[in-house]
Swiss-Prot record:
Protein name: Sulfoacetaldehyde dehydrogenase (acylating)
Catalytic activity, reaction form: sulfoacetaldehyde + NADP(+) + CoA = sulfoacetyl-CoA + NADPH + H(+)
GO molecular function: oxidoreductase activity, acting on the aldehyde or oxo group of donors, NAD or NADP as acceptor
Enzyme class, spelled out: oxidoreductase
pH dependence: Optimum pH is 9.5.
InterPro entries from the UniProt entry: Ald_DH/histidinol_DH, Ald_DH_C, Ald_DH_N, Aldehyde_DH_dom
Triggers of expression: Induced in sulfoacetate-grown cells but not in thiosulfate-grown cells.
């Protein structure tokens, strides 16, 4: 087992080699490693390994996730300049040159280990960097297999395979050391992991907690909205932080919406069964704090129902509960990471917005929200007022937030939540976050202004 310092030495030597690579060579590297975690047989193997090892999600969804995430990053970087001169503006005299950030420490989640690893590797190497991955202990074998596949891709094109490594020492001391000696950290995982990254003294990109919530307005295509929401919630048994945790249909379409949800495999849990479900989903943890039961995370509706001791109809894919107010007093407002969805009936859009704000202020600040509407005034209102880093309109949130062919969001599995969520950016963290940019400025005709140009209108209103 290599030490952190030994692995870092290998990474720096590998990065020094590709530091002089051309754009064409770097793009070949990205295609080489991308193919290894996009090719059908490989990703079927990785998906099966990940589900067996972690117990999270399902194989078919993880195969699709590989295609979406790795394919999306490759699409985003195709033709993009990341080596040398990347921009030149004759009018301003500004030229921009891309430089590597160096060696990146990338911390991976158990819920989405191999596709996240593949997508991140492509984006990081696009900037001529090296990366050392720290997998979740629950996903070590599957993540290591994905990394070995990509290292084989590097060898195929004659690139140093130590551009991509897995941290060999699993101890807490090793990950702490790795974070301190790396040039940049990208942390996708729990709040504890993100806080550790930000506290390391190394520049870091982290994620905030998810609790994605969507409004269904009175003008929505209700059948299509229900279909999208159910597809999103069921996908990989809701491992995605963008999977809808609550939906807020307005009263005018509530009954129709619930009927459509039933058609899409949902079952409404009520009465004593609702209480049993809640008590199964949230239990005291080792510290005595009520927390999400790890046994329900990314499990099927049937497994969750069996654990709760409730009966559900055969073929049920998603468990619904109606939300209660006050919202804080009902645990179903929380992030669930499972095919369990809370439904809140709102009087109208204004009331739906109130519920949305309260939900995301409690859990998931800055992450995301969605709306199913064609009314631009509703979309603009959310854009102006909602403290969310991304607002997804008439789309599946688990697919749309992180980039998808049907929108132009940058492809990623790392969603910044801004200062609202305790993060350094609101952006989808993607390949452009893994380059340093040098600004070269040359003299041009000077800009000038008169006092009248600058303050004329102000003086007319307030005087000098």
């Amino acid at each position: 087992m290599k030490t952190v310092s030994e692995q870092m030495e290998l990474a720096r030597k590998a990065q020094a080699i590709v530091n002089d690579y051309t754009q064409e060579q770097i793009d070949e590297i990205c295609l080489a490693i991308g193919w290894e975690v996009y090719e059908d047989e490989n990703i079927a193997k990785l998906a099966k390994m990940a589900v067996e090892e972690t117990g999270y999600g399902n194989v078919q969804s993880k195969i699709i996730k590989h295609k979406r995430k790795v394919g999306g990053v490759l699409h985003d970087i195709k033709g993009a300049k990341s080596v040398g001169l990347i921009e030149r503006n004759e009018e301003t005299g500004i030229s921009k040159y891309a430089k590597p950030v160096g060696v990146v420490c990338a911390i991976l989640p158990a819920t989405n280990p191999t596709a996240t690893c593949g997508g991140k590797a492509v984006g990081i190497l696009k900037g001529r960097n090296a990366v050392i991955f720290k997998p979740s202990s629950r996903a070590l074998k599957s993540t290591t297999e994905a990394i070995n596949m990509m290292r084989a891709g590097l060898r195929k094109v004659g690139a140093p395979e130590d551009l991509i490594q897995v941290l060999e020492d699993p101890s807490r001391e090793a990950i702490t050391e790795l974070m301190k000696v790396s040039d940049l950290i990208v942390a996708t995982g729990s709040g504890q992991v993100v806080r550790a990254a930000y506290s390391s003294g190394t520049p870091a990109y982290g994620v905030g907690q998810g609790n994605a919530c969507a409004i269904v307005a009175e003008d929505a295509d209700v059948a299509e909205a229900a279909k999208m929401i159910c597809g999103s919630k069921l996908f990989d048994y809701a491992t995605s932080c963008s999977s809808e945790n609550a939906v807020i249909p307005v009263e005018a379409v509530y009954d129709q919406f619930m009927a459509e949800m039933k058609k899409n495999g949902c079952y409404l849990v009520t009465g004593e069964d609702r209480e049993k479900l809640k008590n199964h989903m949230w239990k005291p943890n080792a510290k005595g704090k009520i927390a999400l039961n790890p046994d329900i995370i990314a499990k099927s509706a049937q497994v969750i129902a069996d654990g709760a001791g409730i009966s559900i109809p055969e073929g049920t894919d998603i468990l619904l509960v109606e939300g209660m107010e006050p919202i804080l007093g009902d645990k179903f407002h929380d992030e669930k990471i499972s095919p369990v969805l809370t439904v809140y009936k709102a009087k109208d859009f204004k009331d739906a917005y109130r519920i949305l704000v309260e939900l995301t202020n409690l859990v998931g600040r800055g992450h995301s929200c969605g709306i199913h509407t064609y009314k631009h005034e509703y979309i603009e209102f959310l854009g102006e007022h909602m403290k969310s880093s991304r607002i997804t309109v008439r789309q599946s949130m688990s697919a749309g937030n992180g980039g998808h062919p049907f929108n132009r969001m940058p492809s990623t599995a790392t969603l910044g939540c801004g200062t609202w969520g305790g993060n350094s950016t609101t952006e989808n963290v993607h390949w452009r976050h893994f380059i340093n940019v040098t600004w070269v400025n040359e003299p041009v005709a000077p800009w000038t202004f008169t006092d009248e140009d600058m303050w004329g209108d102000f003086w007319k209103k307030y005087g000098k």
